């Protein structure tokens, strides 16, 4: 994706290989700039690591904006043809192709460790990444590794938190940040944010959960600013009410997710978060409605059917 930032003009057309975060972010921007965008994703849905409902809603929004999206599409190769590139792929067992002025490969990155270590001081590696323990110490005592160099989320804020933990440990201080609670943000329009586990992931782990959801079309500020479809979803343990995850797709989602990062990191319950009053009109009111929905007290959503 670095090369896209060096371009002096907007291409007429762009094919993006991959349907992850980087892909949908660039697709959103370039489509708004008038570029014809095509996304090719090998898995059954875009944003495959996020909540299914988010993937489905974003796909509808992007297609509405003229972006072609092909899922379960296995790319076979890219060939130059005059002043354009032909991206060949297989979809539904049929060979197809997408022609565009440029092709962006957005399927992830590998750590660059070339020349990083001396020959006689190379730590244990696994698939190009440095192996560390829970304290981020490598197989070489006193040598630590954080961020994109190790396994885990390739995010700037995750790397910063890991670095802080290492320094605090070395200084003999109590660790101040829970590095296992990592917010994920997608800068599309509308924004997307997530932390903790989804409802499906909870089921896979055998955790009994309840889910509160608020559709943001009923939010006052969303109506004022004429926002597109969006929602806030909260996942909490069924018996204790402890919040274990949250997924948001709405305006300012990347700013509002912080409330749930704090909640998940501190094992806070739904009732504890409900104690806070939320100003009106704000997007943040949607959080209160989703929390109330978990408790059966939301007044701006359709009531759930009694079991």
Which role does the model predict for each range below?
Residues 44-48, 72, 78, 175-191:
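Flexible, acidic loop-helix segments that line cofactor/substrate-binding pockets
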Residues 70, 124-126, 173-183, 207-212:
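A short alpha-helix-loop-beta-strand transition element characteristic
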Residues 171, 187-198, 203-307:
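Flexible, glycine-rich terminal cap/loop adjacent to redox cofactors
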Residues 1-11, 98-170:
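FAD-site-proximal beta/loop scaffold in flavoenzymes
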Residues 2, 71-73, 213:
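Short loop/edge segments at beta-strand edges and connector loops
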Residues 33-134, 197, 204-208, 217:
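A Rossmann-like FAD-binding core segment of flavoenzymes
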Residues 5, 21-22, 53, 150:
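Residue-level detector of alpha-helix initiation sites
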Residues 8-50, 85, 155:
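Rossmann-like NAD(P)H-binding beta-loop-alpha module
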